[in-house]
């Protein structure tokens, strides 16, 4: 396989990847789910108070809770988190306004609801618990590692405390219930948590698609997306040990994590243009005079793999690298390591490219050596075609015999190509999913490596490097039509890369430059062995 055909094969693989990716987004089969087993009496769904009672704007007091990474707003009516402002992330590049994940304004609803339902639940069709809080604004103080804020509600001799606990440097919120039964009767309640989101379509383009929708984890499924279209098609109902539910968007996620030692039910429903994905825990029985505690957790923030993996098992899988995850994870670890040394994500990408090309160099050398040997055999192969042109079986036998005698692998030029494409796909998803690259500058005009080059300079340079690499490759294609196709390859790639993240284009550009250097070094060595001639280009 010569260089021109390698480039053509790479282009076909690349285009196939884009087409397959878009097909997955538009035509993915809907998950098979069970539509029963959800009790209408006490489960948070479209007909119960846990959703319908909070379909309007906040009606209670709004309490502010803040640590060093986010600012939350909690409605005292029900104790729902109606806003989360992420202090370390800007809404727009170089903007002063902070990124708001949870919000309930301007026609957009995305809130984290939770409460107690069941036989003696305080969240029902009749209304929500109206909690009392001693203050309006709570901020984690300097030198303090945790901030605990109790919301208190009393009914029929039972004191309910919904306690929000924020930790320094963490987007993980403990949302615990303390139920003190001072009545003469045994009571039963069930905890629930759900994310309520306006039903929207996933956005993005063919080059940079983004997913907005639900996801969940269960004992049988480590991670599965459940889109808003899925929710409209059928209600999810999954009984599981542990598990979690989430709503994903580009770079950010909110997730409810129930008690991981309990048997929980995960569910979805839709109502009045809203999608709900949540959990319902097991019934908690509190005898007269007793006190019980129920533990849940809420994550609302960026997709930080290391932190999320510590909060709940498989929550880090919301950073979705697709089928190339086994390559993407070590690449991201390497990228992070280099960035910690050079303090620039663009330089880190260049560093990763150098490492990848160094690892692949033996295969690259083998590829060019194989192609050089194939070129040396062309006169003999042409002679065989003339001798056995009408006898394809005999010609194939003679060709294989020749390859064996000359110790040439006719497919030797394919292996580096087949290895390089999965690495490219893994890097693509790394750049698409890693929130660390969001608004990460390189230098000059590249101020966001996760977005396309605003002036298209990098794609043009990449196209130029591909054109140069093609011209420096020996043995031009003889077929005129194939030659025309090859001449257009750099143009086609350049057009595709106009809308790709600048970080990915940077990788491809640097990779091409390194390939050109490696190519010339390899050719010099082959010249000494008589396997290459500069005149053959």
From Swiss-Prot:
Tell me which domain of life the UniProt entry assigns to the organism this sequence originates from: Bacteria
So what family is this one in? Belongs to the OXA1/ALB3/YidC family. Type 1 subfamily.
One GO MF term attached to the UniProt entry: membrane insertase activity
Query: Membrane topology type, per the record?
Result: Multi-pass membrane protein
Q: What is its main location?
A: membrane
UniProt lineage: Bacteria, Pseudomonadati, Pseudomonadota, Gammaproteobacteria, Pasteurellales
Any one of the GO CC terms: plasma membrane
In terms of HAMAP family, this protein maps to: YidC_type1 (MF_01810)
Gene Ontology biological process terms in this record: protein insertion into membrane; protein transport
Keywords, A to Z, come to: Cell inner membrane, Cell membrane, Chaperone, Membrane, Protein transport, Transmembrane, Transmembrane helix, Transport
Name it.
Membrane protein insertase YidC
InterPro entries for this protein: Membr_insert_YidC (IPR019998), Membr_insert_YidC_N (IPR028053), YidC/ALB3/OXA1/COX18 (IPR001708), YidC/Oxa/ALB_C (IPR028055), YidC_ALB_C (IPR047196), YidC_periplasmic_sf (IPR038221)
UniProt xrefs under Gene3D superfamilies? 2.70.98.90
The protein's gene is named yidC
Q: What does this protein do?
A: Required for the insertion and/or proper folding and/or complex formation of integral membrane proteins into the membrane. Involved in integration of membrane proteins that insert both dependently and independently of the Sec translocase complex, as well as at least some lipoproteins. Aids folding of multispanning membrane proteins.
Which species is this UniProt entry from?
Actinobacillus succinogenes (strain ATCC 55618 / DSM 22257 / CCUG 43843 / 130Z)
- Indicate the quaternary assembly: Interacts with the Sec translocase complex via SecD. Specifically interacts with transmembrane segments of nascent integral membrane proteins during membrane integration.
Q: Where in the cell is it found?
A: Cell inner membrane
Transmembrane parts of this sequence: 6-26, 341-363, 411-431, 449-469, 490-510
């Amino acid at each position: 396989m010569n260089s021109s055909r390698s480039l053509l094969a790479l282009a076909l693989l690349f285009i196939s990847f884009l087409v397959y990716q878009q097909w997955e987004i538009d035509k993915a089969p809907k998950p098979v789910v069970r539509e029963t087993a959800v009790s209408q009496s006490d489960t948070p769904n479209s007909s119960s108070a846990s959703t319908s009672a909070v379909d309007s704007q906040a009606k209670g007091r709004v309490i502010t809770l803040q640590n060093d990474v986010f600012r939350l707003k909690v409605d005292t009516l029900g104790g729902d988190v109606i806003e989360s402002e992420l202090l370390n992330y800007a809404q727009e590049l170089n903007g002063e306004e902070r990124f708001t994940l949870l919000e309930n304004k301007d026609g957009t609803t995305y809130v984290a609801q939770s409460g107690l339902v069941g036989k003696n639940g305080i969240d029902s069709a009749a209304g929500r618990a109206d909690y009392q809080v001693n203050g309006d604004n709570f901020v984690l103080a300097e030198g303090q590692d945790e901030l605990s804020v109790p919301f208190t509600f009393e009914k029929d001799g039972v004191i309910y405390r919904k306690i929000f606990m924020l930790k320094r440097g963490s987007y993980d919120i403990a949302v615990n219930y303390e139920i003190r039964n001072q009545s003469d009767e045994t009571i039963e309640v069930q905890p629930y948590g759900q994310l309520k989101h306006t039903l929207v379509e996933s956005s993005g383009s063919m080059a940079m698609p983004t997913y907005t929708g639900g996801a969940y984890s269960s004992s049988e499924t480590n991670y599965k997306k459940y889109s808003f279209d899925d929710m409209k098609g059928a209600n999810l109902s999954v009984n599981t040990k542990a598990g979690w539910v989430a709503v994903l968007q580009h770079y950010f996620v909110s997730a409810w994590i129930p008690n991981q030692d309990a048997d929980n039910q995960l569910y979805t429903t839709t109502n009045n243009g809203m999608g709900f994905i949540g959990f319902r825990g097991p019934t908690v029985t509190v005898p007269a005079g007793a006190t019980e505690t129920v533990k849940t957790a809420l994550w609302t923030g960026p997709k930080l793999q290391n932190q999320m993996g510590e909060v709940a098992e498989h929550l880090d899988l919301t950073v979705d690298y697709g089928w190339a995850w086994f390559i993407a994870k070590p690449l991201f670890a390497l990228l992070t390591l280099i960035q910690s040394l050079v303090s620039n994500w663009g330089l880190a990408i260049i560093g990763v490219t150098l490492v990848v090309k160094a690892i692949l160099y033996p295969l690259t050398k083998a590829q060019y050596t194989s192609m050089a040997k194939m070129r040396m055999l062309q006169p003999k192969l042409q002679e065989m075609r003339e001798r056995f042109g009408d006898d394809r079986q005999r010609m194939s036998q003679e060709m294989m015999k020749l390859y064996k005698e000359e110790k040439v692998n006719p497919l030797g030029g394919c292996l580096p190509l087949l290895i390089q494409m999965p690495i490219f796909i893994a890097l693509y998803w790394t750049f698409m999913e890693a929130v660390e690259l969001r608004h990460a500058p390189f230098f000059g005009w590249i101020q966001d490596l996760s977005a396309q080059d605003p002036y298209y300079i990098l794609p043009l340079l990449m196209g130029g490097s591909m054109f140069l690499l093609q011209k420096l490759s020996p043995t031009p294609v003889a077929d005129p039509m194939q030659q025309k196709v090859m001449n257009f390859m750099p143009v086609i790639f350049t057009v595709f890369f106009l809308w790709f993240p600048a970080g990915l284009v940077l990788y491809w550009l640097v990779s091409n430059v390194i390939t050109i250097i490696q190519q010339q070094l390899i050719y010099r060595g082959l010249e000494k062995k008589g396997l290459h001639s500069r005149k053959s280009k």
